[in-house]
């Protein structure tokens, strides 16, 4: 059995889950903590929403929201068209869980499982950095929503 490559991180945010949810699902905020294509529509992301990036090698990187439980959980499947092995939808994903803690929200982030794909360690390492950086921006944006 291959060791799982799942990034796990969390942060306590001094804002309620409604504000954190807005930062996770509104493109104007997402663009500050993640990349969006230039022409992405300014509609809230919901279950079924997709973001498609054209890759320099001719492939596509596609993210699709496969679960959206408002103010509780957001699961975004990742698929890259030129991966040699195609995992099942959702087996490689970004998962954001929100838990109310009084006036604050605990945001738990899980990204992976990258052991299912070739060069998974490279994706894992990049995702460790992404989780660390993005959680700080999500915290700042959520706490400044007022």
Each language-model region and where it sits:
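Generic structural detector for well-ordered beta-strands
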Residues: 10-12, 52-54, 64, 97
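A structural signal for short, well-ordered beta-strand segments
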Residues: 7-11, 96, 109-111
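Hydrophobic pocket/interface hotspot
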Residues: 20-24, 30, 51, 65, ...
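Glycine-centered tight beta-turn/hairpin loop motif at sheet-sheet or coil-to-beta transitions
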Residues: 4, 56-58
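Hydrophobic ligand-binding cavity/cleft-lining segments
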Residues: 1-41
């Amino acid at each position: 059995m291959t060791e799982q490559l799942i990034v796990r991180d969390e942060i306590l945010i001094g804002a309620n889950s409604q504000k954190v949810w807005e930062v996770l699902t509104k493109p104007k905020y997402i663009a500050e903590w993640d990349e969006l294509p230039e022409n992405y529509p300014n509609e809230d992301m919901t279950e079924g929403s997709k973001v498609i990036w054209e890759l320099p090698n001719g492939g596509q990187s596609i993210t699709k929201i496969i679960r959206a439980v408002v103010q509780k959980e957001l699961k975004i499947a990742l698929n890259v068209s030129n991966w040699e092995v195609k995992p099942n939808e959702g087996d490689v994903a970004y998962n954001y869980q929100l838990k109310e803690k009084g006036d604050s929200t605990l945001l738990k982030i899980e990204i992976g499982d990258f052991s299912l794909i070739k060069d998974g360690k490279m994706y894992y390492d990049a995702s460790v950095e992404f989780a660390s950086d993005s959680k700080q921006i999500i915290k700042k944006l959520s706490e400044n929503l007022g």
